[in-house]
């Protein structure tokens, strides 16, 4: 799949990111994204048919067993929370006022 990097894509990314870029920044971002995509296209051209898969140095990951356990009750869950309201945790605003 070929991604076309153009002004419309940059504007779309600005909207998704909730940022505004100057024309100079837009042009720089367009060039950067184009270079990144070209780099990945070069990687995709590599012939890896004779390359063996990598191994992990440890026989098993350091993840804990996922064993079910009883959840915290509401009182204990809210015990150390700074901001709570009506039994819910109040987080910081992320957008708007």
Swiss-Prot record:
It is an enzyme of class 6 (ligase). It comes from the Archaea. Residues 58-78 are annotated as: Disordered. Residues 63-77 have a biased composition (Basic and acidic residues). GO terms for molecular function: asparaginyl-tRNA synthase (glutamine-hydrolyzing) activity; ATP binding; glutaminyl-tRNA synthase (glutamine-hydrolyzing) activity. Keywords: ATP-binding, Ligase, Nucleotide-binding, Protein biosynthesis. It catalyses: L-glutamyl-tRNA(Gln) + L-glutamine + ATP + H2O = L-glutaminyl-tRNA(Gln) + L-glutamate + ADP + phosphate + H(+); L-aspartyl-tRNA(Asn) + L-glutamine + ATP + H2O = L-asparaginyl-tRNA(Asn) + L-glutamate + ADP + phosphate + 2 H(+). It holds the Pfam family GatC. Allows the formation of correctly charged Asn-tRNA(Asn) or Gln-tRNA(Gln) through the transamidation of misacylated Asp-tRNA(Asn) or Glu-tRNA(Gln) in organisms which lack either or both of asparaginyl-tRNA or glutaminyl-tRNA synthetases. The reaction takes place in the presence of glutamine and ATP through an activated phospho-Asp-tRNA(Asn) or phospho-Glu-tRNA(Gln). This is Aspartyl/glutamyl-tRNA(Asn/Gln) amidotransferase subunit C. It comes from Saccharolobus islandicus (strain L.S.2.15 / Lassen #1).
């Amino acid at each position: 799949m070929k991604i076309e990097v153009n002004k419309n894509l940059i504007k779309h990314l600005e909207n998704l990111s909730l940022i505004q870029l100057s024309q100079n920044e837009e042009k720089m971002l367009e060039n950067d994204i184009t270079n990144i995509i070209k780099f990945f296209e070069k990687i995709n051209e590599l012939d890896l048919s004779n390359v063996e898969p990598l191994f992990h140095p440890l026989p098993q990951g350091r993840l804990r067993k996922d064993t079910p356990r009883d959840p915290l009750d509401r009182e204990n869950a809210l015990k150390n929370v700074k901001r709570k309201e009506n039994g819910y945790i109040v987080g910081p605003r992320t957008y708007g006022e």
